[in-house]
Amino acid sequence: MKLSTPEEVKAFNRNTYSALFKGALVGSSLGIAGWLIGNRYSAGFRRLPFSLKSWLVIGSGSGASIIFADKAGLKFEAERYGKFDQIDYSTKGLPWNQRALYYFNEHKWPIILGTWASTMGLSLYAASRNRYDTAPQKLIQARMYAQGVTVVVLLGSVYLSTLANRLEPLEREVLVTDPSNPTKLVAFKQRKERYPGELQWEVLVSQDEERLRKLNLPLREPHGSTGPMSTPTPALNSSRSA
């Protein structure tokens, strides 16, 4: 995301903090509901120590807050820069491995959270078949397996993100909304940033052009016009001779 002004940075931070709070509230509410249901209908859950029960609330609140913040950032960028942003990346022409990497980067956090939840469920099912362990021991085993798999997935996501950035072409054609006609899509060649903020000037130019359009001003000075930028400056030699 490209934030060009301090006001946009503040607005983005407010939006992110609000989404974090909402996600933590929703996730914690679901965790508390699961806690209450488990205490009422499961004798094994009631025998668990308080630390394991509280981990259910903390884990669900943290995971939901991350997902909410990620979705809020994408929504903020789409609302603020929708007319300059990409509409269709047209990944059909890319090889299958690059399409898979692109899909993983777009849905990274839901995949990680889903992997943790599915591993936790499968581990609980496998541990429940052992008749010699107690319920707390089964839950601890399931949590260890789930955490181990989640750590492996996190490390793999870092590697895949680095690999996707390395395989991304330096220039690709995307479709963007025509500022003069919002119902029309035009082809645009997007260049890859070699370092963060390299193409920041393009966003600034687009914003300035949009401001000039709202004021009904020309985007460029007419050729041969006399203005502050076209006023000739006297040469040093002529001023000295005078």
Curated annotation (Swiss-Prot):
Domain HIG1 residues, every copy: 80-172
PANTHER family assigned: RESPIRATORY SUPERCOMPLEX FACTOR 2, MITOCHONDRIAL (PTHR28018:SF3)
Gene from which this protein is expressed: rcf2
Bilayer topology term: Multi-pass membrane protein
Compositional bias (Polar residues): 227-242
PROSITE patterns found in the cross-reference section: HIG1
Ranges that cross the membrane: 18-38, 48-68, 108-128, 144-164
Subunit structure comment from the entry: Associates with the respiratory chain complex III/complex IV supercomplex.
Keyword Mitochondrion set for record: yes
Annotated region (Disordered), positions in chain: 215-242
Key words of the record: Membrane, Mitochondrion, Transmembrane, Transmembrane helix
Protein known as: Respiratory supercomplex factor 2 homolog C1565.01
Pfam families recorded: HIG_1_N
